[in-house]
Amino acid sequence: MAEHEFHKINLLIITPYEDFYEGMVDSVRIPTSDGEFGFMAGHSPFVAALEPGACVLTTGGETKYCMLSEGYCEINGMLALIVCNSAEWPEDIRLRRIINAYKAAIEEIKTHQDKNGRPVFSEDSVAKGKRALARMRFIERYGTDQQRERLADYKKSDFPDGKIPRLQ
């Protein structure tokens, strides 16, 4: 048993609201500002900035997926600490909230203009839009069939031609 545990890394995912996940895992894949990054037990020390996206946890042949928002990850041998603003399992994501957040971000971007009438991109508005878009992509990839169908329905009813407008 001890030898088996040696090949696992202790993963902690912490948000301001809860200790989202704690457990021994075989491997983890996270969304970083430099792209997707994977690690296992014994990885050299590492710190990375997180981007909104999917976190993939693998242990004992089972794979779990969760959605992470902005934050950071620190790896130190047998411990990986992820601190982020929010973390959600697919079944906990509210689809209507995602669509509304994306629409609000687009509206904020459209209404903020410089003196020449050109859009001024507020970092907060762009970040809000990116989080919503990352959640939509997460559901399209890892959500249940019902969630994917509902998301497609929301996109059709809320966006022309069912296409999501670009942020910028």
Model-derived regions, located:
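A short local loop/turn or secondary-structure capping micro-motif enriched for an aromatic residue
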Residues: 30, 47, 74-75, 90-92
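Short alpha-helix boundary/capping segments
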Residues: 42, 60-63, 86-97
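Acidic/glycine-rich phosphate/pyrophosphate-binding loops and surrounding catalytic core
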Residues: 89-168
